[in-house]
């Protein structure tokens, strides 16, 4: 039994592996190259495939997903012009941002804009009257 070197070269493409009791003859037809590669080598990853996966996750029915949240945000912002401007204005900004993230771009932007106006009026201008 060999301890330091398990592979004993016999000829150009033939190896003898000694595992103790019996040996195994390994023949390789690789034109003189003796490198071993692992079976875990995967094909290269392309980042462009990932955008296609994300498009498939969202179907056409979810386009109006944030519209209800957008209307709620707009209502909060408009009500904040008359009642509790700091509290409802901040709520309108936060809910408007959530609506924008969910696809209601216009409603979310209007809710955030009106909420900012109401917040500025409530903090800086109304206390002086």
Swiss-Prot record:
Its main location: membrane. The chain crosses the membrane at residues 78-98, 109-129. It is a multi-pass membrane protein. It is found in: Cell membrane. Keywords: Cell membrane, Membrane, Transmembrane, Transmembrane helix. It comes from the Bacteria. Residues 46-58 have a biased composition (Basic and acidic residues). This is Uncharacterized protein YqfX.
């Amino acid at each position: 039994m060999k301890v330091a070197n398990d592979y004993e070269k016999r000829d150009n493409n033939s190896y003898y592996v000694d595992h103790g009791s019996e040996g195994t003859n390994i023949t390789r037809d690789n034109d003189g190259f003796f490198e071993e590669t692992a079976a875990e080598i995967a094909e290269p990853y392309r980042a462009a495939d990932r955008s296609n996966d994300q498009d498939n996750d969202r179907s056409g029915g979810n386009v109006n997903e944030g519209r209800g949240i957008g209307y709620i945000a707009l209502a909060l912002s408009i009500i904040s012009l008359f009642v509790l401007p700091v509290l409802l204005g901040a709520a309108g900004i936060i809910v408007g941002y959530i609506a924008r993230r969910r696809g209601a771009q216009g409603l979310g932007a209007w809710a955030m804009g009106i909420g900012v106006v109401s917040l500025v009026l409530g903090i800086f201008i109304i206390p002086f009257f």
